[in-house]
Amino acid sequence: FKHRRSPQQRGPHSKPHPQPHGNKSSGSGFIIDSGGYVVTNSHVIDGGEEIFVTLMDGTRLAATLIGGDAKSDLALLKIDAPVALPALNFGDSTTMRVGSPVVALGNPFGLGHSATMGIISARGRGIGSGPYDDFLQIDAPINPGNSGGPLFNTQGEVIGVNTAIFSPSGGNVGIGFAIPASLAQDIVADLMDDGKVERAWLGVAIQQLSVEMAESLGIDDADGAIVSEVMEGSPAAAAGMMEGDVILS
């Protein structure tokens, strides 16, 4: 699908980024509900003023952004189609093993629907992209424009969302990354229900309680943690936690 950008906006810095076409960019996505819900990457539609989805038969439909989550790089769109749409099902990504065959679908370089095959090269791969640094590494060729496309197992179930590549040149070198379905399903469910993802947080910084600290505080047992900082306006501050408090359990 494609979206328009205003002239002053820049494209996302994530890889693979949407392939630019003047003031337009393109990416990939997939339908998860016959009513027209579409999953894609957050960086694909970030900054877009108008979003359009092109179906397999060439039908072009305007899309509404239901919600996006930059931390997981996932977004949920909604299109209104005159008929019920065929939808994909999520599979269990936790069953995938190194060497498991996979198929990646997408829209590389805006060329249109393309499929590539490969295997799971690694699981739990971290690439330093944010708090959810737990990717499926694949060798199926993916390129700019594949972002947001589905990664299938041999049963035709979506076990990942293609989201990034490692490449010094910007093109495919056989190292791609997909968000596992185990995470994507939870994020998408939150976006569908609330349009956003609410995350629990405490708002404190802690450090291990050392023997020396315990002795200076008059504590017999050094098992625990000491609060070194309480963030203003945080749940911890509202609960009355203070710097220097010792957490024992």
Spans of features found by a protein language model:
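Serine-dependent protease modules
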Residues: 1-239
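Conserved catalytic motifs of ABC-family nucleotide-binding domains
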Residues: 244
